[in-house]
Amino acid sequence: MSDIENKNENLELELEDNTILSNLFGINDRNLSLIEQINQVKIQYRGNKIKISGNKKSIFETKKTILNLFKEAQNGAEIDEDRIRDNKSLISINTKTDKQME
């Protein structure tokens, strides 16, 4: 990896519906911890504001994961480890496909 890919960056998100966050974050923030572990990022939040820290690619994938899972939670889905891992797999496949098309 180049120095640019290893450089830590930050991204802030704001999610509009606080009632969904407990489902998204999980009991004792278990879902957030899993997302951090899978994507090798650090996630901090206060209320509906989320800060993601890590390398650029990991931040991008984490943002996509959180937004996808948030939409699923809005539609009534229970967010659990399997759903998080499935979402990560889809994002990884789409990212690889996008790079191949470039």
PLM features: what roles do these ranges have?
Residues 3-23:
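Short glycine-/aliphatic-rich beta-strand segments at the starts of folded cytosolic domains
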Residues 20-37:
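Short amphipathic alpha-helix segments
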Residues 16, 27, 54-57:
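Structured loop/turn residues at secondary-structure junctions
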Residues 36-44:
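A short, structured beta-strand/loop element
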